[in-house]
């Protein structure tokens, strides 16, 4: 009697294992996957908008960045190297702009938003933060040794989490000096 109760779930498990293995093998990280061209990009959820001179630049889900040169009547999609959700965009000059979003992504454009390059992501941000605080601790710039060691350990822990933290806003005073939060 117990054998009959065990066999169906066991068969179901055996039959689904190849599907799970196939899904895992085909997974691509959104930080390594460029945003897909989509006719619906301008109609998808857009989280942030900015002006790049007369151009309107909007950012949204799946790495979509759309541009309008006619006040929003028509939109074109920009080339974006990631498919992480983007939440904010800012242009301190008509040509130079910054966009931020999930997975710790920071993008930069030097051509009014037509193309974007990755400046930082959650993987490299953790490594950068850990190396900075380790160097500061080595110089004695972080205060007492036990506090400095705890801070260095915390930055290493944050870095080990990977790219799960988001940047939610961006602002630049000029094309080189700004803040991301």
What are these model-derived regions, one by one?
Residues 21-181:
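Residue-level hotspots at or immediately adjacent to binding/recognition sites across diverse folds
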Residues 7-9, 38:
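Short, functionally important structural connectors and interaction interfaces within domains
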């Amino acid at each position: 009697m117990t054998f009959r109760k065990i066999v169906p779930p066991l068969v179901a498990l055996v039959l689904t294992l190849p599907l799970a293995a196939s899904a895992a093998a085909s997974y691509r990280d959104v930080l390594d996957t460029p945003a897909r061209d989509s006719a619906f990009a301008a109609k998808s959820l857009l989280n942030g908008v900015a002006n790049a001179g007369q151009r309107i630049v909007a950012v949204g889900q799946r790495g979509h960045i759309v541009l309008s040169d006619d006040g929003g009547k028509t939109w074109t999609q920009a080339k974006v190297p990631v498919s992480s959700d983007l939440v904010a965009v800012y242009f301190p000059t008509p040509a130079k702009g910054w966009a931020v979003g999930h997975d710790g992504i920071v993008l930069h454009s030097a051509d009014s938003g037509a193309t974007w390059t990755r400046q930082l992501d959650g993987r490299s941000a953790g490594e950068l933060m850990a190396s900075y605080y380790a160097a500061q601790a080595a110089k004695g710039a972080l205060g007492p040794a036990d506090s400095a060691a705890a801070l260095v350990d915390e930055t290493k822990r944050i870095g080990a989490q990977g790219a799960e933290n988001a940047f939610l806003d961006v602002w630049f005073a000029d094309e080189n000096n700004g803040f991301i939060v």
